[in-house]
């Protein structure tokens, strides 16, 4: 026993989860992501802390709704990186990118997914881990979705384009 009163077992307890943390860090940096499309998103969107686009209208709209600065920057950079022209927040309309904030209840997410799939739009669901009900719905969306999904713990990206069925949890 150490002078602190903690046994060796108590001091090494955190090592139990080390492998999953290392794997997440590895994927977050883009290593182990075998899709060039998603790898570019990880490197050019998730790892950037400053705005890369000249137009920052999505950034301003998300900040106005109380979304964290880092998430606003990432989503604005995603819109610029993917070349999306139009976007919508919490409404189903003809655009390239739809963002569902916490204002969209978990039981209303499935109509957004169906609309995005029908119109081949990209859907972003913010805070998929906020509560158990929201996560259950998001997990079902990922399981049934025919294309690529990217979950970076802050939001879930549901792509409806040329990509094959792949699930990335970063």
What do these predicted ranges mean?
Residues 1-119, 129-170:
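A short alpha-helical cap/connector motif
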């Amino acid at each position: 026993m150490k002078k602190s009163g903690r046994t060796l077992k108590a001091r090494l307890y955190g090592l139990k989860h080390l492998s999953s943390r290392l794997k997440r860090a590895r994927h977050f940096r883009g290593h182990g992501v075998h899709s060039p499309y998603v790898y570019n998103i990880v490197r050019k969107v998730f790892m950037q802390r400053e705005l890369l686009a000249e137009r920052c209208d999505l950034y301003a709209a998300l900040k106005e709704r109380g979304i964290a600065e880092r998430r606003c920057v990432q989503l604005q950079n995603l819109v610029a990186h993917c070349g999306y022209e139009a976007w919508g927040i919490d409404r189903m309309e003809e655009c390239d990118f739809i963002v569902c904030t916490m204002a969209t209840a978990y039981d209303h997410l499935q109509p957004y997914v169906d609309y995005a799939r029908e119109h081949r739009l990209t859907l972003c669901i913010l805070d998929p881990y906020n509560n158990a009900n929201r996560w259950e719905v998001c997990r079902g969306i990922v399981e049934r979705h025919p294309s690529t999904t990217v979950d970076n713990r802050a939001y879930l990206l549901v792509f409806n384009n040329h990509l094959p069925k792949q699930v990335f949890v970063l």
